[in-house]
Amino acid sequence: MKFSIQHARDAEFRADGLREYFEYRDLGIRDATGGHAVMHVIRARKGTNATGEWHRHEVGLQLVYVLRGWARFEYEGVGEVLMEAGTCVHQPPGIRHRELAHSEDFEVLEIVTPADFRTESVPPPPGTAGAR
């Protein structure tokens, strides 16, 4: 592990992350922790919308803290959730979920362990829209 510092004035957002409707700012934690964790700021890309695709992540820990704007997600066993500035969400490992919509100014801080984790598309959970 090593010291790391990132400044907003040097921020670079990239559109090469997990979702095409978001931009990602790497905060250097993957490198600082030797891959034990990743931390980034994620924001909505202008002119894009959520796809509503059900998926899950193979993670040890996933925390999301909303910095600005809002988003509506749907979680297996929970239902629809509105996230807005100040909301903190712990997504248990493997929980099926999908994003339904977000504001143009939606921005979150996300922390995930490990840094390299698997994401897979999954069928809708029983009792949700599109389930068989």
For each predicted feature, which ranges?
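N-terminal presequences and immediately downstream first alpha-helices
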Residues: 1-21
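Double-stranded beta-helix
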Residues: 2-9, 98-132
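A short glycine-rich, His/Asp/Glu-containing loop-to-beta-strand
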Residues: 14-55, 60
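Flexible, glycine-rich phosphate/dinucleotide-binding loops
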Residues: 33, 72, 117-118
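Short, conserved beta-strand element in jelly-roll/cupin
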Residues: 41-44, 56-73, 111-114
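A generic "binding-loop/recognition-motif" signal
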Residues: 59, 79, 95-96, 104-105
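A generic structural motif
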Residues: 74-76, 100
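Short acidic-glycine-tyrosine-enriched beta hairpin
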Residues: 77-94
